[in-house]
Amino acid sequence: MGVAAVLDWLVQDGERLASCRHDHPFAVLGPQASDQGWTVRMWMPEAQSVSLLQAGEEIAMTTPNHPWVFEAQVSQDPGCHYRVKVERGGIVHEQHDPWAFRGEWMGEMDRHLFAEGNHHHIWQKMGAHLTERDGITGVMFCLWAPNALSVSVIGDLNSWDGRHHPMQQRVGGIWELFVPGLEEGHLYKYEIRTQDGHCYQKADPYGFQHEVRPDNSSVVARLNGFQWSDQTWMQKRDSSNALDQPISVYEMHLGSWIHASADEPWIQPDGTPRPPVPAADMKPGARLLTYAELADRLIPYVKDRGFTHIEVMPITEHPFDGSWGYQVTGWYAPTSRYGTPDEFRAFVDRCHAEGIGVIIDWVPGHFPKDAHGLAFFDGAHLYEHSDPRIGEHKEWGTLIFNYSRNEVRNFLVANLIFWFEQFHIDGIRVDAVASMLYRDYLRPDGEWLPNESGGRENTEAVRFLQQANHVLFQHFPGALSIAEESTTWPMVTQPTDSGGLGFNLKWNMGWMHDMLDYFELDPWFRQFHQNNITFSIWYTYTENFMLALSHDEVVHGKSHLMHKMPGDDWQKYANTRALLSYMWTHPGKKTIFMGMEFGQRAEWNVWGDLQWDLLNYEPHKGIQRLVDDLNVLYKAEPALWRDDFDQFGFQWIDCNDNRHSVISFMRRESASGTWLVVVANFTPQSHSHYRVGVPLSGFYEEIFNSDAAKYGGSNLGNMGGKPTDEWGIHGYENSLDLCLPPLSLMVFKHDPKRSLNSSEPDNIV
């Protein structure tokens, strides 16, 4: 190439750089070998002068080809340690040359694994990484944007001007740039120039921290600086069967559990106040609690209640409070509403120290259309399908991931591993699984596309869920993976090698709807709907079910649990206690939403907080005591959880007394052979001398009674227990003559050490 051609080429490169249209800046910038030695070129928009500093010498750089392309001649390869002195706008500073660091960040194997969808730690390459290259500290930026014409890093480092830091395109649509000297806390985005000339500013899909809403820039954050203290917990978890334990989950939304006053900011460890994050518009002057404050207040509360796990509604970064977190824009970052990533790590660490597991809601089914997010990311439908018939949830106003694309699946599967590895979470609840499994979900005829076989099943999503669960349990065998799946899709909790989806728990939506339909009935009509409370047993062993009374049942005009109940206030309290008691004694793991544990009356509202003042009233305090005691009973009696998924664990005594709306059954444990007798009366009418058959003669201690005075009940019961009579009923030769309190549930335990002739105890219940 002649001199004139080279000069013309450099002029064109300068124009491409100036117009943010250059995809290979390393071809012209940084150290470049030539016949005369080495040329060092720097791209410095709007700089007045630039000098090369090397080996104690300052060499003035010239602009022979473009006013912003500065260059100097040196005799030897300058490497990457040289610095430049830049004068811009009357300010002089020194820096290293970003385009001197030419080595690839993502290696060939990284690119290969990512392209086939199997790079389970891709976040260690993608995103913004505080690192050191050739002894120089800075931040390595790495982005996947295969359809982009050019990509630049913008942010605090360059006054958000995309002309300053163009990135280098690598194989496979990967863009890279190392910015020396950049530190933790810097704000940044990517400026993406599309093939048709449009320019978008996007947050980092792999960003590890983002600004507090309404701002939405990504933040350079350190990944591995937190000192964990939960090694014993983690070792025990991953060496245990996740389901062979009592699981009682407190589902909650961090931002609406309780608020604090903005006049009382949280004082950070360095002694400075944290700027308050307003708690929206329902309570002027209210602010959100920080992760640290939640650790101080929430964890002791949950521990006192006896729950084994906290499930937090989505804490991944999201722009709109009203989405409850289910419209995610920052998949690799806990929301900054409540603090920093390390503060969330400290929250999890504290939970583990107190014996409480942490489950997060994970939303791989869809994402919002926010301009800074994944939608139309690089000028093309990169993360979503291009056809709205399979790529858009019109009712939700969101987009659907293209699960057929390897890199998109990799983004999600690695994200799952990221949360377990980086934040030590113990489980996930996957939201809206049914919306992923069916192509016609919430779609009228003509607005969806069938699969390759002509069916409605989304086979791509099925394969994705199977891959995600398979990889999860490979890495974390003690994890919980819970599906919110509202249809009868088969084998949700069966292993993937058997054709199942690979979850180990599924929310029992049928049980939830049947229970709420039943308990909303006037008790007189319940005799005609006995099937509602018995039907679940006929299918409960088809999956590993978790019983859930979730946030979805206390919003959008459905009212809270207390207000669903019929009758006067006393009956509402009693019905609530009876429902919760039946839930805790029914096969399946447990989840209730915050507020249910004390009888919240108002619907949940994300803009407010819970009605904590209700605990000043004894009936609500009684419901809280009931939940406390149910959790104590549940954890103390393996018959209530050990064989949740084995038919041996449950046996009806009588489910046919429709007229009285009474049911009785046994919960059994195979390992010890112990069992419990459960009797429930779902009408306000008490019953004396009610006979219940039992398998062995002897004394049966009444170990729980939801009608006890301390719970707000009428204090009817069986004097602490009853001996059996030789009166055959329900297929047994022996039976108990019981008093059944109104709207109640009781649990009895056979006491082999107690004689039938023992004197009766003095207590009433």
Swiss-Prot record:
EC number: 2.4.1.18
Purpose of the protein: Catalyzes the formation of the alpha-1,6-glucosidic linkages in glycogen by scission of a 1,4-alpha-linked oligosaccharide from growing alpha-1,4-glucan chains and the subsequent attachment of the oligosaccharide to the alpha-1,6 position.
Catalytic activity of the protein: Transfers a segment of a (1->4)-alpha-D-glucan chain to a primary hydroxy group in a similar glucan chain
UniProt record similarity statement: Belongs to the glycosyl hydrolase 13 family. GlgB subfamily.
UniProt pathway annotation: Glycan biosynthesis; glycogen biosynthesis
Listed InterPro entries: A-amylase/branching_C (IPR006048), Branching_enzy (IPR037439), GlgB (IPR006407), GlgB_N (IPR054169), GlgB_N_E_set_prok (IPR044143), Glyco_hydro_13_cat_dom (IPR006047), Glyco_hydro_13_N (IPR004193), Glyco_hydro_b (IPR013780)
Taxonomic lineage: Bacteria, Bacillati, Cyanobacteriota, Cyanophyceae, Synechococcales
Active site: 431 (nucleophile), 484 (proton donor)
Organism per entry: Synechococcus sp. (strain CC9605)
Coiled-coil stretches noted in the UniProt entry, renumbered to this chain: none
Domain of life (superkingdom): Bacteria
Gene: glgB
GO MF annotation, one: 1,4-alpha-glucan branching enzyme activity
A GO cellular component annotation in the UniProt record: cytosol
GO biological process, one term: glycogen biosynthetic process
Subunit structure: Monomer.
Keywords of this entry: Carbohydrate metabolism, Glycogen biosynthesis, Glycogen metabolism, Glycosyltransferase, Transferase
Protein name as catalogued: 1,4-alpha-glucan branching enzyme GlgB
